[in-house]
Amino acid sequence: MHLGFHYHLPAFEENGKIYTIAFQGLFIDSLAEYCDQVTLFLFTPTQAERKEMQYAIRSKKVKLVSLMKHYNIPLRILLYPTIRKQIKTMINTLDILLMRAPTPLLPLITKDIKGKIPFAYLVVGEMSLHVDSIKQQEWRKSLIRQYVNWNESNQEKHAKDGLIFANSSAAFEKYKTLSNNCVQVKTTTLRNEDFYIREDTCLNPPYQILFTGRIEQEKGLLEITEAIGKLHKESIDCRLNIVGWILPKDPTESLIRKIASEYGIEDKIIFHGFKSAGEELFSFYKAADLFIVASQNNEGFPRTIWEALANSVPVICTPVGSISQVLTNEHNAVFIEPKNSESIKEKIKFLIQNPTKRKEIIQNGLETVKEVTLEIQSKKMVDAIKSFITP
């Protein structure tokens, strides 16, 4: 089977190797294992983006069709005719095109390939859920909302003719009414070799609290920092390790440092920067006592939670989006209230002071995540694709 793949995250080729962001590269390599060939239709990164493209795709079955530079969304749409020519050149060689969604050019690409080759969507979220939280002038936000509505309505309209992979229970419930070919999957960066089994954490202070992901206020990082400060006042010694990337001009890091200064805990909040998925990132999970993500908005299930569970780290999280459909409070995670530093403080303290419950959560978490591996999920996807394209 010759699989095509498109998403808006870029990639580039250098010295005979294809480089992209780690979670995308791991996913592509895992698909390639079950395909004859995989052709990537991906944008070319800007110079600033290249430093994040640290994963070299391993499979020799993967080829890259480099699209235009990763311009802003309006410019990509305006210049789409250039991309159309590249896709048309390759279209007859593909058995199916898989698009991770949402992605800006999905409506245009689908329109061009529909009726010519089969297509599939891997639905990992909904842009409309995040428009209101965008920090833009109202007129800009109105334009963004119009674009998002256009993109999502086209995605839903075309779903009836494609194969849909849904990354959450909510997405599955929605798309199974729109498509006769809908499969629920769990996107992940985990391989079988990545699991780290241990019985317990929080054995000695300072307790290592870990956050991984995009550094933004919507992830609850200001409240998490405040909770660490409150624990400090109660003589509970914690370190907050923040691993991830921050968007240009985003004020979150400076606001975190301001709160840390107010509580006198500047030395207890450590920014480690962006780390690639794999051993570099997983070394932080192995050293962590607790993992926390305090998302304030509805979202899909964060793959960072899967990573924490697989590394035997107790998870503290808000039950937003798909999280409450997968995790159960005080069974395989501990829930906190959104935007509530006091709730965060109390749950961190609860896990530190209750080893029996902590061990139980670790074991239940490992049981929850045991089938969320690239080996299992990618084979499930490829098997579904082969069934879909076989008459």
What are these regions (language model features)?
Residues 145-196:
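A short, active-site helix/loop in glycosyltransferases that binds the activated sugar's phosphate group
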